[in-house]
């Protein structure tokens, strides 16, 4: 009886999912055939040269981690120039602008992050070679910011009336050390925190066929090993924090983790010491732990801390502690929640239907993006590409291809997805 019941439920779920997929496609088809939406898509084509100019202008205002303010001011001004009303920069540094709908639909937020991974002083000038734009951050995420601007202009030019309000956002703190601080403020303290019903992050160049519906969780540590230190010759035989850290790294490298759900670890940066002929007082490392599963991430973090302490204990047993012992301190410097927006949820089905409409087959993936935060809070969220193509993200020779056909198609795909979520009058 239980087996039959389970099979019945399973069949119902499959049938319901298939029915919803068909319904989502009909929604997207209807929106795509709307005369105002067709006019908006034609405007995007005519607006493309301006998009390229704006990509360059945005990119050439540096936005290192925690220093996005100048780019935020520029983007806020660009939003105002589209005619968007009530543009503001919130206390965390996010740029916000609301496009009002009829009030009968959900509030949909669409965001592109302002910050880059590149430190202050990086040459962020853009070089153009034919259809290629080259410059650090040009694809991640200057293009996406320019795409939001083009979508606003297109909707206004074509007089597209959405049922739901659309909140356009240029947010801070998406990249590494930022630890999603812009999203944390938006969803935990910002004035729209209880109103956002769906969230779309536009991040990176690409055709738009991939839908990031999984949030890759991470926990990052700054680990410090301390000891008494001393002269390399005169104090030889004392405990050495470098040896303890080396043992810790070796122990970390031997921790077994599952391939599904994918779980990883990495020692990314090491430092410490004062001179070649000194036993250091202090050495440190920065460690990145990641998993698609909250449970696996927690399990890995517990094992990691255990091995750090064990490595310090081993060094204290191996050498003299008459001047002091090795101690270890692991401080969390970043934490991103994990989770998933189900493939059969309305937001994913509508995004997939839009992908189909533009001649692609949707794929689904897991990533560490602005969507992590809303997903963890139960807000339906996805991350999509901004169109075109590109490569070498996070490298000084980062590039995007702004060939018009693929670039415009990608912008219109993002816009269609957005309109499917907000609804069109």
Predicted segment positions?
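A non-catalytic alpha/beta surface segment that caps or lines the substrate-entry region
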Residues: 53-106
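Bacterial N-terminal signal peptides that target proteins for export
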Residues: 1-9
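Bacterial N-terminal signal peptides
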Residues: 8-16
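Acidic-glycine-rich active-site phosphate/pyrophosphate-binding loop
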Residues: 115-128, 200, 212-224
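Catalytic-core environment of secreted peptidases
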Residues: 98-143
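Metal-dependent amide/peptide-bond hydrolase catalytic core
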Residues: 22-39, 56, 242-425
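Acidic/histidine-rich catalytic neighborhood of metal-dependent amide-processing enzymes
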Residues: 132, 137-216, 258, 277
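N-terminal hydrophobic or amphipathic helices/low-complexity stretches enriched
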Residues: 20-64, 212-217
């Amino acid at each position: 009886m239980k087996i039959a019941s389970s099979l019945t439920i399973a069949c119902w779920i499959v049938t319901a999912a298939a029915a919803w997929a068909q319904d989502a496609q009909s929604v997207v088809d209807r929106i795509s055939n709307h005369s105002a939406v067709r006019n908006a898509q034609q405007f995007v084509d005519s607006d493309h040269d301006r998009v390229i100019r704006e990509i360059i202008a945005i990119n050439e205002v540096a936005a290192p981690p925690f220093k996005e303010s100048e780019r935020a001011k520029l983007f806020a001004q660009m939003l105002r120039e589209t005619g968007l009303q009530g543009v503001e920069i919130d206390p965390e540094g996010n740029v916000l602008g609301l496009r009002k709908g009829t009030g009968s639909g959900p509030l949909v937020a669409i965001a592109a992050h302002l910050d880059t991974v590149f430190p202050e002083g990086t040459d962020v000038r853009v070089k153009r070679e034919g259809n290629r734009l080259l410059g650090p951050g040009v694809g991640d995420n200057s293009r996406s910011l320019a795409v939001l601007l083009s979508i606003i202009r297109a909707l206004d030019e074509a007089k597209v009336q959405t049922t739901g309000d659309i909140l356009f956002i240029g947010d801070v703190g998406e990249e590494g050390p930022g630890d999603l601080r812009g999203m944390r403020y938006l969803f935990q303290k910002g004035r729209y925190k209880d109103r956002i019903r769906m969230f779309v992050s536009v991040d990176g160049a690409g055709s738009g066929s991939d839908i990031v519906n999984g949030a890759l969780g991470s926990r990052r540590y700054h680990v410090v090993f301390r000891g008494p230190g001393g002269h390399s010759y005169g104090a030889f035989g004392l405990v050495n924090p470098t040896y303890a850290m080396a043992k810790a790294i070796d122990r970390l490298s031997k921790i077994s983790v599952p391939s599904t759900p994918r779980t990883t670890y990495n020692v990314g940066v090491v430092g410490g010491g004062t001179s070649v002929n000194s036993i250091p007082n202090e050495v440190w490392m920065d460690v990145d732990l990641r998993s698609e599963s909250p449970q696996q991430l927690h399990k890995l973090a517990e094992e990691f801390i255990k091995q750090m302490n064990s490595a310090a204990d081993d060094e204290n047993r191996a050498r003299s502690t008459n001047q002091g012992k090795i101690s270890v301190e692991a401080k969390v410097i970043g934490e991103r929640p994990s989770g998933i927006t189900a493939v059969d949820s309305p937001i994913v089905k509508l995004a997939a239907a839009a992908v189909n409409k533009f001649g692609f087959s949707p794929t689904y993936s897991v990533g560490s993006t602005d969507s992590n935060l809303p997903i963890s809070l139960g807000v339906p969220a996805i991350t999509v590409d901004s169109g075109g193509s590109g490569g070498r993200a996070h490298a000084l020779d980062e590039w995007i291809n702004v060939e018009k056909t693929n670039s415009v198609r990608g912008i219109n795909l993002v816009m269609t997805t957005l309109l499917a979520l907000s609804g069109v009058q």
